[in-house]
């Protein structure tokens, strides 16, 4: 509780003490934490299943060596020309910015009121930091929402326009023919998945993957609703069995525990299911880029402006069937 020497601020005192200068000072003091706040927000869910690539200046190309070599019976005369090629995939980051006007008194009273309920009396600098953290975390929330379905649109104004998300990249590669049945990295479901066929459908999809992919630990990235269908179907089939004591199934039945479900909230409505590894889905950023910044200004009376800039981009590192498999869903309509 607040002590006599730590009296709670009145609204007028709050207005006088929490100024644009205080917020700007807080933004400078906690610049790195604010710039990384969107990433920290992503760690709550999506970054558990994808890989963050920091320090990307404009772009970085990942080369994949594809070739074949094998042993044969010993021969002094053995000599073969190498059959190989290097395939490069480029992770590009794009600068984005946010200019957000807010009523300082509404925000201050909301955050300050929360502290009063808890019996706290935060310092002015602590309040300023919390205010900025709320906005920075919101930026991370939108990044998380659109990391799969974003479509690069230079004329856009939202996070969904900043870069091509993973699903957008995948859909473009399907159209280009780089993901196909012929290449062995595409499976097409023959019927819509529901609560009566989800187990068989997902098992069939997994079985269709390349043997090398099935031999390593992978994630199955899917719409949470499809995962719930799988759980319901599995429970309906096996609920009475003695060993079936755990409703939540973390790995796909029949994968020998190698394929772990990744039912991400931001995959809701996705038209595909993906089997791959964490290091195949790359999110690029650069917190040290001079364009990355968080600031607060007062451009007009009674209105503060939160300014944030950062660079982000996504890429699928390899489309190789040995590391990547896509299942194209069939619509129920």
Q: What are the residue ranges of the model-derived segments?
A:
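Short helix/loop capping segments that flank catalytic or ligand/cofactor-binding pockets
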Residues: 110, 144, 229-231
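Beta-edge loop/turn motif
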Residues: 216-226
């Amino acid at each position: 509780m607040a002590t006599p020497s730590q009296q709670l601020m009145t609204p007028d005192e709050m207005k006088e003490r929490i100024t644009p200068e205080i917020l700007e000072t807080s933004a400078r003091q906690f610049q790195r934490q604010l710039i990384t706040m969107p990433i920290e927000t992503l760690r709550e869910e999506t970054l558990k299943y994808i890989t963050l690539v920091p320090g990307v200046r404009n772009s970085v190309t990942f080369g994949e060596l594809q070739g074949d070599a094998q042993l044969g019976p010993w021969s002094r005369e053995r000599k073969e020309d190498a059959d190989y090629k290097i395939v490069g995939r480029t992770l590009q980051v794009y600068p984005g910015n946010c200019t957000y006007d807010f009523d300082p008194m509404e925000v201050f009273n909301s955050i300050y009121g929360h502290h009063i309920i808890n019996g706290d009396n935060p310092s002015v600098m602590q309040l300023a930091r919390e205010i900025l953290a709320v906005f920075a975390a919101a930026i991370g929330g939108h990044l998380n929402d659109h990391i799969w379905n974003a479509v690069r649109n230079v004329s856009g104004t939202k996070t969904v326009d900043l870069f091509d998300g993973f699903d957008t990249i995948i859909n473009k590669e399907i159209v280009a023919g780089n993901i196909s049945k012929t290449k062995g990295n595409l499976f097409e479901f023959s019927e819509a998945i529901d609560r009566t066929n989800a187990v068989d459908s997902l098992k069939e999809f997994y079985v269709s993957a390349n043997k090398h992919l099935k031999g390593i630990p992978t994630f199955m990235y899917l719409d949470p609703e499809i995962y719930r269908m799988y759980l319901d179907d599995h429970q309906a089939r096996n609920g009475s069995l003695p060993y079936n004591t755990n409703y939540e199934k973390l790995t796909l039945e029949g994968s020998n525990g190698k394929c772990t479900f990744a039912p991400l909230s931001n995959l809701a409505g996705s038209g595909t299911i993906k089997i791959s590894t964490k290091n195949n889905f790359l999110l690029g950023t650069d917190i040290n880029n001079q364009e990355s910044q968080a600031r607060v200004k007062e451009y007009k009376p009674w209105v503060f402006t939160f300014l944030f800039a950062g660079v982000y981009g996504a890429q699928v590192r390899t489309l190789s069937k040995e590391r990547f498999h896509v299942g194209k869903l069939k619509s129920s309509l």
